[in-house]
């Protein structure tokens, strides 16, 4: 019975793959924020979620004021929170107020935790075609100016400017309409382009919500924001970023979080996760940039693969002798073979070669992919080992065996005869912004704490090692080819 319960629990975690684990229940999540090693997000109604590792989430974040759809941004050594007090039909109409407040920390247990008095920065009267709700923040990295986009389907998406030192409305600033037919907007900047993200479709209808996230871009923060075919978002344009998936629907309230150069994630909610009673949950997915446009990447889920280096296209493998497969010699000159019926040749099996392998640790290397047992890897999530933003850690073993890839104390990679669950045998796998992946050991023997610097690295065409991550070299990048 105990084994059955364990199996069912594992299946439940696997089935809820669209959501983070723990209690990730939230609606209208703010952009993720990091404070003293923990991650925070705030939602409609006050409060929010906290995570120690970015994978398992629980309630406990504290935000006064109630209201809806907050956003949060670290500016200097303080955190600015912005939220809608009413509007969006919450009070029976569309008269709304957007307010800002500051805190030195997001940790409600800290002695420094205290929100400043909330200050109104804009409002809607319920009569005009505008709704002061759903604010999103952007601190322009090129100018230092602080912008807010806000609004709903009730009217336009508007842009205003705040003073980044006070969080107050910039004196003399006049609002500008920049989009329609969306809500829960957000702004981001990349490579000379400003991007306006908007949530399109129907909200708050559970498994029937059609929410999806669209985007346009502009060379100016004030627009116009055009999509991939030139449609202005002020006239209903928008390129799809993420929509419903097989077991979840209602993607809304985009937020961008940069982990490292070339490592970005988007936070949002699913209006309904079908595996979690159709509840609204936090989701975190990689951002992949394709031809200058953001799209939702895929959280790695494990399976059977060969692991290919981006540097050369060679495969990661065990350093063992190559065992030849038996086949009658071919050629135009072998008339006897040419007259035989055609039949398939079976792949080489593990049983045919495993006894030729050493019994202890076997170093890893990189070589031509030949679909041989020493090149076939099984990658399995280890949910009980914790995780990082978007995923749990994984173990990487030779398919059909317990032989596991591991980091060594001298920053090399080897395989140990049997997986033990040690931190150096756990791997962080993240999709990069170009669609490739980085692979990082959770820990390196002899180094303190969780490893956040060193990744699997092609030191040469045939030599894997561990080296500091650098997005600007293909030596750090890998691809997983499904078997």
Which residues are covered by each model-predicted region?
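Beta-rich carbohydrate-recognition and catalytic domains
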Residues: 20-133, 139-182, 189-242, 261-304, ...
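Short, surface-exposed coil-to-beta transition loops
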Residues: 250-252, 280-281, 450-453
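Lectin-like carbohydrate-binding module/patch detector with strong preference for beta-trefoil
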Residues: 302-483
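Signature of short aromatic-glycine-proline-rich micro-motifs recurring in repeat-based ectodomains
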Residues: 244-258
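Hydrophobic h-region of N-terminal signal peptides that target proteins for export
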Residues: 9-18
């Amino acid at each position: 019975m105990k084994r059955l319960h364990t199996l069912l629990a594992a299946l439940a975690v696997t089935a809820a793959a669209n959501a983070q684990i723990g209690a990730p229940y939230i609606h209208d999540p703010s952009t993720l924020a990091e404070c003293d090693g923990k991650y925070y997000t705030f939602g409609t109604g006050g409060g929010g979620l906290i995570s120690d590792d970015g994978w398992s989430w629980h309630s406990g974040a504290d935000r006064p004021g109630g209201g809806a759809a907050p956003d949060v941004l670290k500016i200097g050594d303080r955190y600015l929170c912005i939220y809608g007090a009413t509007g969006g039909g919450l009070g029976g109409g569309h008269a709304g107020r957007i307010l800002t407040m500051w805190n030195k920390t997001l940790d409600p247990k800290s002695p420094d935790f205290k929100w400043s008095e909330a200050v109104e920065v804009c409002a809607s009267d319920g009569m005009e075609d505008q709704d002061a709700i759903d604010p999103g923040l952007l601190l322009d990295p090129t100018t230092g100016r602080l912008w807010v986009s806000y609004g709903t389907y009730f009217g336009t998406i508007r842009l205003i400017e705040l003073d980044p030192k006070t969080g107050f409305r910039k004196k003399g600033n006049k609002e500008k309409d920049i989009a329609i037919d969306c809500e829960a907007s957000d702004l981001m900047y990349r490579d000379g382009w400003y991007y306006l993200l908007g949530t399109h479709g129907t909200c708050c209808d559970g498994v029937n919500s059609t929410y999806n996230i669209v985007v346009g871009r502009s060379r100016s923060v004030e627009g116009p924001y055009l999509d991939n075919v030139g449609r202005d978002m002020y006239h209903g344009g928008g390129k799809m970023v993420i929509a419903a998936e097989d077991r979840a629907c209602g993607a809304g309230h985009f937020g961008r979080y940069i982990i490292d150069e070339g490592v970005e994630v988007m936070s949002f909610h699913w209006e309904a996760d079908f595996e979690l009673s159709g509840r609204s949950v936090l989701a975190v997915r990689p951002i992949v940039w394709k031809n200058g446009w953001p799209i939702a990447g895929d959280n790695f889920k494990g399976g059977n693969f060969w692991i290919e280096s981006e540097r050369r296209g060679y495969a990661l493998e065990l350093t063992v002798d190559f065992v030849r497969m038996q086949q009658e010699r071919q050629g135009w000159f072998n008339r006897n073979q040419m007259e035989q019926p055609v039949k398939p040749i079976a792949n080489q099996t593990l049983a045919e070669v495993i006894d030729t392998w050493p019994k202890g640790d076997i170093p890893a290397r990189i070589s031509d992919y030949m679909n041989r047992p020493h090149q076939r890897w099984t990658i399995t999530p280890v949910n009980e080992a914790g995780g990082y933003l978007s995923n749990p850690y994984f173990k990487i073993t030779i398919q059909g065996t317990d032989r596991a890839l591991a980091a060594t104390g001298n920053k090399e990679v080897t395989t140990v005869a049997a997986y033990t669950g040690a931190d150096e045998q756990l791997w962080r796998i993240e999709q990069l912004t170009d669609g490739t992946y980085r692979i990082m050991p959770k820990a390196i023997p002899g180094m303190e704490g969780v490893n956040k610097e060193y990744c699997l690295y092609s030191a040469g065409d045939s030599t894997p090692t561990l080296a500091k991550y650098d997005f600007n070299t293909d030596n750090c990048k890998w691809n997983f080819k499904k078997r």
